[in-house]
């Protein structure tokens, strides 16, 4: 398995620190508002990466934090006349709920920053003792960037270049404009905790570094997030951890590409800003995932509702193909053509191999789905050519490949067959002489009666059956695998 490191800008063979096990951390949200679809793209991407690692036989421990104390939360609380804790609790719960709606698996560990103050203070004390951090008179504590000889390696930045763009303020209390806060002295009305430097709260970068160390140990195998976090957040996390514990922080850094909307950067001022919650009110999570995974996780993703509608249509085609394959297996007639069946079996094997090869090549979901859609065409061609005389084992294997591929991507296919209404039994008794009490058998009887009427060119009877089914919210669908009754 090859994984691209955004630190080295190269793919390399993935070798976990502990054979067969993966320790993985992805930065969670700052919980002051509903997450937008750009955030969702990152979380869905790493959900699929996690799923593929598990499917590949790894034991994965996945941690993701909730940043529940931060300037943004405090500002939102002040705007609304609420406490920071109330805002953080509301949007923490909303985040967890919408992630589940998006079929993102819960993390194994979900630490909240406000519950981890002790480990953060311990890390800051260690950094001060080792000369990598310093407290100032007002109670702030800063990390000395120049004390870390490796600073800039995660994001590819150079300290001299950073100095050119650094803001140098009057009465600067920091020793160096590049230094960043590990601990912020308390301000009136803000959440704060006791520390050796007085009341205050941790800096954002400090939170993640301390939580990774506590719950996963360092170094970890994979640290991920959106590309906007590479600098300064991930750079500063790594600097603290490396200097505090004298070990590498993460063996592989992974970052997702930006999300655009109709080719433009998403922003509220342009009116193209969408939360995940509002998108999922009108569209399925499965279609959204399918749309997002048709672009490689590192590439920019151009989102549009037209493309999302297209993904809904593709999803229906996928589900319909799987349904047709299973239906054909259950209703096979005649002697199957061995050569045709072998061609289908070969297509399954080839698509399966290509899907796996793409996923093992830096989780290339776009390539994997390309192979997958090629197979969907092959499967439908087989059903057309077989004309009901299918090889049951071959078509079931094909359906299983479709379902397995979607499952590993976290894409839940629409219900394959809605339960037929009980009224269809009386209709079949009236129109087809059916005497049983099974809805599926009743549907078969009506299909047979309709086919018989059409063969006799008795269009009035055939149309009457069609119309009566329509009144029950049903339709007869003619497929390559044969006719069947389904909900409209």
Regions found by a protein language model. Give the residues of each.
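Alpha-helical recognition segments enriched in aromatics with Gly/Pro capping
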Residues: 1-32, 47, 118-328
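N-terminal, positively charged nucleic-acid-binding surface of large information/translation enzymes
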Residues: 8-11, 17-105, 481-485
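Alpha-helix C-terminal capping/helix-coil junction sites
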Residues: 54, 100, 128-129, 254, ...
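Short phosphate-binding/catalytic loops that engage adenosine nucleotides
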Residues: 58, 132, 474
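Short, glycine/charge-rich beta-strand/loop segments that flank catalytic centers
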Residues: 66-71, 92-95, 105-120, 138-147
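The substrate-binding groove and active-site-proximal loops of carbohydrate-active enzymes
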Residues: 77-84, 108-114, 198, 226
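Structural preference for alpha-helix termini/caps and helix-kink/transition segments
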Residues: 275-488
């Amino acid at each position: 398995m090859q994984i691209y490191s955004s630190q080295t800008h190269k793919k390399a063979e993935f070798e976990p620190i502990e054979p067969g096990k993966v320790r993985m951390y992805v930065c969670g949200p700052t919980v002051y508002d509903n997450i937008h679809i750009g955030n969702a793209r990152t979380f869905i991407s790493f959900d699929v990466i996690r799923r593929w690692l598990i499917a590949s036989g790894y034991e994965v421990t996945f941690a993701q934090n909730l940043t529940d104390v931060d300037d943004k939360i405090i500002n939102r609380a002040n705007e609304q006349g609420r406490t920071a804790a109330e805002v953080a609790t509301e949007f923490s719960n909303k985040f967890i709920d919408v992630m589940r709606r998006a079929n993102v698996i819960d993390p194994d560990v979900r630490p909240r920053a406000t519950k981890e103050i002790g480990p953060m203070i311990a890390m800051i004390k260690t950094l001060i003792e080792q000369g990598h951090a310093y407290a100032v008179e007002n109670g702030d504590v800063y990390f000395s960037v120049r004390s870390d000889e490796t600073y800039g390696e995660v994001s590819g930045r150079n300290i001299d270049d950073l100095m050119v763009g650094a803001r140098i303020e009057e009465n600067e209390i920091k020793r160096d404009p590049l230094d960043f806060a590990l601990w912020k002295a308390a301000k009136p009305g803000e959440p704060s905790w006791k520390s050796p430097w007085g009341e205050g709260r941790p800096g954002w970068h400090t939170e993640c570094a301390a939580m990774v160390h506590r719950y996963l140990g360092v170094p970890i195998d994979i640290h991920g997030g959106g590309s906007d976090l590479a600098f300064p957040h991930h750079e500063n996390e790594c600097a603290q951890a490396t200097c505090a514990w004298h070990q590498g922080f993460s063996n592989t850094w992974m970052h997702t590409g930006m999300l655009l909307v109709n080719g433009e950067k998403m922003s509220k001022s342009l009116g193209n800003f969408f939360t995940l919650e509002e998108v999922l009110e009108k569209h399925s999570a499965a279609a959204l995932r399918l749309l997002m995974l048709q672009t490689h996780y590192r590439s920019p993703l151009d989102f549009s509702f037209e493309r999302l509608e297209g993904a809904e249509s593709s999803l229906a085609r996928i589900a319909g193909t799987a349904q047709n394959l299973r239906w054909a297996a259950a209703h096979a007639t005649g002697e199957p053509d061995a050569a045709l069946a072998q061609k289908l079996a070969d297509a399954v094997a080839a698509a399966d191999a290509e899907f796996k090869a793409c996923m093992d090549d830096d989780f290339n979901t776009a390539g994997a789905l390309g192979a997958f859609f090629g197979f969907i065409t092959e499967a439908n061609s087989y059903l057309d050519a077989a004309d009901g005389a299918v090889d049951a084992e071959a078509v079931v294997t094909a359906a299983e490949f479709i379902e397995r591929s979607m499952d590993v991507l976290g894409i839940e296919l629409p219900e394959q067959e809605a339960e037929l209404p009980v009224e269809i039994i009386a209709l079949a008794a009236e129109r087809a002489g059916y005497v049983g009490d099974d809805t599926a058998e009743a549907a078969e009887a009506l299909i047979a009666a309709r086919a018989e009427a059409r063969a006799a060119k008795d269009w009035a009877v055939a149309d009457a059956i069609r119309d009566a089914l329509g009144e029950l919210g049903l339709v007869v669908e003619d497929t390559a695998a044969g006719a069947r009754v389904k909900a409209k």
